[in-house]
């Protein structure tokens, strides 16, 4: 039906008969001469038709998004008529034949216009997908999936599918539940991850497993979250952290080569505590410096009791400083006010600062600091004339969070981030447990191997866990798993999952661990998030063919939707009104 894709045509084809097919992107009638921009997956080419052509009458019928097959000779555009914005901007096709394969209603959205309301784009997603940019995204997505399969297969991994209909074993988010028609009153759960099945595959001697897995989580959505998503999932037997990290680094190196980036190995490694203390995040963006500096000791003799008391409680409190070079000339009073309002959203009670000026140090904190304290702050932060040093003080968790966010906000405001840089990082030595209102829960998941389970302070127990971070975004992570029943029971006890509950929820796993489970570990990389970063897309919804909204609904199909009474009866379900 066609001889070329639109953008395959070049100056070397001038004089040749060309046949192309696609959609009418734009239509123009200039004094009797008709111009049609034809669009296919590759891009645009201009068709031109004058009244002498036998295709002219048909060309007059064409409107936006009509499906066309066109035949004609390629020629150079006239002087001054080239379009440098198009790959085919120097040539056009003089129409000899034109077939309208299908007509189109007036499109409710402009194809390729990202400023169109997103809800409207999602409602007509099949039109939104017609843009060449969308095609390039899904072409790359397909290529990355193929690279993943080839790379892992070469390393001896087997691609094995794990069940979609499974048992509910909550991993932090809510499960999506599927009622069983055969087993009245019982439910399957859609998997939040293949975690337990891939561990069972290791018990079964599969040694190295992977799949590009579909996962489901019923949780509140954010810009980078979807209720159903895809991850590159893998597990290895007889391995340690270094083995797993090596596989991930090799895989990411191969993947990013596809978009022309050479990334070096091994990736930098940073302990969790260092990431939190120096950057206020467990996924720090290292494309710029701006570290957080601990200055609690500079406030020990502060005349302000609030600051001095915080300084004397280093276990639970923090006083962090952020020195922004040259900010005194760049940040007006209104900008400083905006930054204060910004951190208040995340629990800050205000934003104290010192301005380092030619005639001395200014700012609301000066009166509370001794001369020695001020001197120490300048030494610790490296502050010079023209700088502004911001301070956060209070509860450790809150201060680290809002100062980390302030760090990012300042970097964005001052354009300190190299948008073309790729900064990979491993964050390691995560805490095994996190405190909640009802005790403790597993920071990653309860199947992670702890490093020092006998430590009396539960908050000091670390996990054999690791996250891979790119430019401040968590790409994925993994851990070495527990492979002995006794250790698994100990971890369950720490998070108040006692024997009866453990057997009810995870009895099949505990049983499997009795039969010679090998040491094993693995990882998962968020596939959608990876493609979002590689394509520099604004939202994860741009890289999923038919995504859900932030309210977990599909505007295209109107899912979820009610079901009829007969279906409910078959499933033994009665709805309360």
Swiss-Prot record:
Name of the protein in its database record: Aspartate--tRNA(Asp/Asn) ligase
Residues marked Important for tRNA non-discrimination (site): 30, 80
Position of the signal peptide: none
GO molecular function: aspartate-tRNA ligase activity; aspartate-tRNA(Asn) ligase activity; ATP binding; nucleic acid binding
Any Gene Ontology biological process: aspartyl-tRNA aminoacylation
The keyword ATP-binding is annotated on this UniProt entry: yes
EC number, as in UniProt: 6.1.1.23
Subunit structure as annotated in this protein's UniProt entry: Homodimer.
Region named Aspartate: 195-198
Matches recorded under InterPro entries: Aa-tRNA-synt_II (IPR004364), aa-tRNA-synth_II (IPR006195), aa-tRNA-synth_II/BPL/LPL (IPR045864), Asp-tRNA-ligase_1 (IPR004524), Asp-tRNA-ligase_1_N (IPR047089), Asp/Asn-tRNA-synth_IIb (IPR002312), AspRS_core (IPR047090), GAD-like_sf (IPR004115)
GO cellular component, one term: cytoplasm
Function: Aspartyl-tRNA synthetase with relaxed tRNA specificity since it is able to aspartylate not only its cognate tRNA(Asp) but also tRNA(Asn). Reaction proceeds in two steps: L-aspartate is first activated by ATP to form Asp-AMP and then transferred to the acceptor end of tRNA(Asp/Asn).
Pfam families: GAD, tRNA-synt_2, tRNA_anti-codon
Record: residues binding L-aspartate: 171, 217, 444, 481
């Amino acid at each position: 039906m066609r001889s070329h894709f639109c953008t395959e045509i070049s100056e070397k084809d001038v004089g040749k008969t060309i046949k192309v097919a696609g959609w009418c992107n734009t239509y123009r009638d200039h004094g009797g001469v008709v111009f049609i921009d034809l669009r296919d997956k590759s891009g645009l080419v201009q068709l031109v038709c004058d009244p002498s052509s036998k295709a002219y009458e048909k060309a007059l019928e064409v409107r936006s998004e009509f499906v066309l097959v066109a035949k004609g000779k390629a020629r150079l555009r006239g002087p001054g008529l080239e379009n440098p914005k198009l790959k085919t901007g120097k040539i056009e096709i003089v129409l000899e034949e034109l077939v309208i394969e299908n007509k189109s209603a007036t499109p409710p959205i402009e194809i390729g216009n990202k400023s169109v309301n997103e809800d409207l784009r999602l409602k007509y997603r099949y039109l939104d997908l017609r843009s060449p940019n969308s095609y390039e995204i899904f072409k790359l997505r397909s290529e990355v999936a193929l690279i993943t399969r080839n790379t892992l297969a070469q390393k001896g991994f087997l691609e094995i599918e794990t069940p979609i209909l499974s048992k509910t074993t909550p991993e932090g988010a809510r499960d999506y539940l599927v009622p069983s028609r055969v087993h009245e009153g019982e439910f399957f759960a859609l998997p939040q991850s293949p975690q337990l099945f891939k561990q069972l595959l290791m018990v079964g001697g599969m040694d190295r497993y992977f799949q590009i897995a579909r996962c489901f989580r019923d949780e509140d959505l954010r810009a980078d979250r979807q209720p159903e998503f895809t991850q590159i999932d893998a597990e290895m037997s007889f391995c340690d952290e270094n083995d797993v990290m090596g596989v991930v680094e090799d895989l990411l190196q191969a993947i990013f080569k596809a978009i022309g980036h050479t990334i070096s190995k091994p990736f930098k490694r940073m302990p969790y505590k260092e990431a939190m203390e120096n950057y206020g995040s467990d996924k720090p963006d290292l494309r710029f410096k701006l570290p957080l500096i601990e200055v609690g000791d500079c406030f020990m003799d502060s005349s302000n009791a609030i600051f001095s008391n915080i300084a004397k409680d280093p276990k639970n409190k923090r006083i962090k400083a952020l020195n922004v070079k040259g900010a005194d000339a760049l940040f007006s009073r209104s900008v400083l006010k905006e930054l204060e309002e910004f951190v208040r959203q995340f629990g800050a009670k205000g934003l104290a600062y010192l301005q380092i000026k030619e005639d001395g140090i200014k700012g609301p904190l000066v009166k509370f600091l001794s001369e020695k304290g001020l001197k120490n702050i300048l030494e610790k932060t490296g502050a010079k004339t023209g700088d502004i040093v911001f301070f956060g003080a209070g509860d450790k968790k809150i201060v680290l969070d809002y100062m980390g966010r302030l760090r990012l906000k300042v970097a964005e405001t001052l354009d300190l981030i190299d948008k073309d840089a790729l900064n990979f990082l491993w964050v390691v030595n995560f805490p095994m447990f996190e405190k909640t209102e009802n005790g403790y829960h597993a920071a990653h998941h309860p199947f992670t191997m702890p490093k020092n389970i006998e430590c009396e302070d539960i908050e000091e127990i670390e996990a054999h866990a690791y996250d891979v971070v790119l430019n401040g975004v968590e790409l994925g992570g993994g851990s070495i798993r527990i492979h002995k029943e006794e250790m698994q029971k100990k971890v369950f006890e720490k998070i108040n999952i006692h024997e009866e509950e453990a057997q009810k929820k995870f009895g099949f796993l505990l049983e499997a661990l009795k039969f010679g489970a090998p040491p094993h570990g693995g990882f998962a990389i968020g596939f959608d998030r990876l493609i979002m970063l590689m394509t520099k897309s604004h939202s994860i919804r741009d890289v999923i063919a038919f995504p859900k909204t932030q309210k977990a609904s599909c505007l295209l199909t109107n899912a979820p939707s009610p079901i009829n009474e007969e279906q409910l009866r078959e499933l033994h379900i009665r709805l309360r009104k």
